[in-house]
Amino acid sequence: MLLSKKIAVEINIAGCKLKQYTAAMLRQHNIDLTPEQFLLIDLLWNQGPMSQLDIADQMQKDKNSITKLVDAIERKGYVVRQQNPNDRRSNTIVLTELGNSLKDDAKTKGIFILNNMLDGIPESELNSFLETLDKLCSNMTISDREL
């Protein structure tokens, strides 16, 4: 198998395993969120209220996927949509009291989950891995001249 193909396959497998592992660990720690829902709520904890468009940009997802994610966590009572006073066509996603109440416990458990995943890997290797991932992502950014 070509090295480039092997790398692409391994990145895909790692992404799938990350979602499966995180979902299982969230369930095990009684956090009623999918990994993507957790990431969205974590984004709101860190950034504050955001438009769905900004969330889509930050999470690298299309608007329809974000709408479904917001719908799901809104049904659970973690967020509400508030109409943007400056643009009636857009909504701002705001954490509810329930959404904010998860923060300390969920962040602590989230850090524990991630630390378990990285257990036994030296920090120098993790830093090299991050540098390589950054380069891969840069190479995969589509510019106007490539279209």
Task: State the predicted function of each range.
Residues 56:
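The alpha-helix within a helix-turn-helix
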Residues 1-29:
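N-terminal leader segment of winged-helix/HTH proteins
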Residues 1-2, 124-147:
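C-terminal regulatory/oligomerization modules of transcriptional regulators
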Residues 40-41:
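Short alpha-helical "packing" element that flanks the helix-turn-helix/winged-helix DNA-binding module
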Residues 52-53, 64, 71, 91:
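Residues within helix-turn-helix
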Residues 71-131:
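Charged, amphipathic alpha-helical coiled-coil/dimerization segments
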Residues 47-51:
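Short capping segments at the starts of secondary-structure elements
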